[in-house]
A protein has these predicted regions:
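Metal-dependent nucleic-acid phosphoesterase active-site entry motif
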Residues: 1-18
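A secondary-structure boundary/capping signal
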Residues: 5-7, 38, 104-105, 121
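Active-site neighborhoods of divalent-metal-dependent phosphate/nucleic-acid chemistry enzymes
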Residues: 70-102, 106, 110
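The start of beta-strands in P-loop NTPase/AAA+ ATPase cores
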Residues: 1-3, 98-100, 116
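Acidic, PIN/NYN-like endoribonuclease modules and their adjacent C-terminal/linker elements
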Residues: 106-149
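PIN/NYN-family metal-dependent endoribonuclease catalytic core
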Residues: 5, 20-50
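Short, hinge-like loop/turn segments at secondary-structure boundaries
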Residues: 51-56, 119-120
């Protein structure tokens, strides 16, 4: 599953380790979700987070996020929303084929869908992700029981 993460999600994850944003970040770092971004977006996020985040442990976690991030190249600039910085998120979608854009920005969320990618809040994403994960494991458990494996 490929996702694009808005910077506000990374910032919010630092504020609350029980938040959906933090849970998503951990799933990405653990390799269960693939996060995608353009090189430019990644560089800008790194700079912003260095200024805003003071907690050393969280800074290390964010650096791990950047290490596992799938960096893509922008092939075509887009103009989907009024904020040029937010348009870079949509460029990441177009370049990566991501299935979800996770954001808490109201203007970004108003788009709802772009190139087959759902634009969702962390809570909505988490609920869909866990529902898909639970369905798969239940089916797997059931099939193992029937097959005796």
């Amino acid at each position: 599953m490929k996702v694009v993460i808005d910077t506000n999600i990374l910032i919010n994850a630092a504020a609350d380790e029980s938040s959906y944003a933090f849970r998503i970040l951990k799933e990405i770092i653990d390799g269960r979700i693939e996060a995608c971004a353009t090189h430019q977006t990644m560089s800008e996020n790194r700079q912003m987070l260095r200024k805003l985040v003071r907690d050393r442990e969280y800074k290390d976690l964010v650096e791990e996020f950047f290490r596992v991030l799938n960096v893509t190249k922008v092939y075509k600039p887009v103009n989907v929303v009024s904020d040029p910085e937010d348009n870079k998120l949509f460029e990441s979608i177009a370049a990566s084929g991501a299935e979800y854009l996770i954001s808490e920005d109201k203007e970004v969320l108003a788009v709802e869908e772009y190139h087959g990618c759902e634009v969702v809040t962390p809570k909505d994403f988490w609920n869909k992700y866990k529902s898909d994960s639970d369905d798969g494991s239940a089916w797997s458990d059931w099939s193992h029981m029937l097959m005796g494996k």
